[in-house]
């Protein structure tokens, strides 16, 4: 379960503030769509899920595999971020837009996930403590 992997992450990486972690993925790119009678075939790239940790130094992305286990870690310092925007979505996801030098990353932040009440609580905590706004 996702919450079990979150607990492992907190212990392994000695994370001080468990509530400063959320869950999301980078924007998905659709490469092609092939509509056929009775079925539609499409190819997408970029669907990698992450635990995303915010602290005073920056944002850490912990990439997850299909079992929601951490397989890699990437860090972006607040000093390296040229522009940071957070847009509230209508239904399932919000969007975080990070600009580093000339590159823009679009990250979808899940508002909730079935059987994972912590996600909604953590997102409320992050918004309330201004973590989503540089």
What annotation goes with each model-predicted range?
Residues 5-11, 15, 70, 74-134:
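Acidic, Ser/Thr- and proline-rich intrinsically disordered linker/docking segments
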Residues 38, 43, 65-68, 103:
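Generic preference for well-ordered secondary structure
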């Amino acid at each position: 379960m996702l919450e079990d992997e979150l607990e492992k992450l907190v212990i392994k990486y000695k994370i001080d503030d468990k509530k400063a972690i959320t869950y999301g993925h980078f924007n998905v790119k659709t490469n092609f769509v092939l509509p056929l009678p009775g079925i539609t075939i499409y190819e997408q790239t970029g669907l990698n899920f992450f635990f995303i940790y915010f602290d005073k130094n920056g944002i850490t992305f912990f990439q997850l595999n299909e079992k929601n286990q951490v397989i890699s870690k990437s860090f972006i310092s607040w000093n390296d971020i040229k522009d940071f925007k957070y847009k509230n979505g209508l239904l399932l996801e919000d969007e975080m837009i990070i600009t580093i030098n000339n590159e823009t990353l679009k990250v979808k932040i899940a508002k909730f996930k079935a059987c994972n009440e912590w996600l909604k609580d953590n997102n409320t905590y992050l918004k309330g403590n201004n973590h989503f706004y540089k």
